[in-house]
Amino acid sequence: AIVGENLLIEKQKDIEIVQKLGFSKCRVSLAVPKDIETNDLQYFQGKKIATSYPNTVKTFLAKNNIQAEIHVISGSVEIAPNIGLADGICDIVSSGSTLFKNGLRETVTILKSEAVLAKNKKLTPEKLEILDQLIFRIQAVIRSKNTKYILMNVPNDKIQEVSDILPVLKSPTIVPLVEEGWSSLHS
């Protein structure tokens, strides 16, 4: 499956992350009303936190010896402090604009997340073979992100000069053109 890493962590499923995909990046963060001046995690000691990620929050708070009351909300978590339901929230943050619009500010990042390719650990050999092909293709796209395909028509007497300055793996592909003395150079 292609899923947000944050959801896998929250659901605590025994699923293996095969490949991070590099898109849909976000953070799961604690946020407080903008008039609260501290960024200290201790602020949340004994406070109420609204979230759609109760397992993630409980685990994080326990590791940091913080005891807080967690209110589980499905959607629009950012309104909880404004209606008196919570002292702060924990939610996904990409740009922070939703927090800003609701008078909140990010204080502590619990985890960073992105889209991942994940698999069940009990795949059949046939499905594993299909998955391996998919992984190969995804990794090829990721590796090629910083490369460009160049195609140009070049006079034959300039092919070596142009080839010398092109970034190529081995050598460019050269295809003669109909017009005499010219070739198409691919790299």
Label every model-predicted segment.
Residues 2-15, 34-187:
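Small-molecule-sensing regulatory modules
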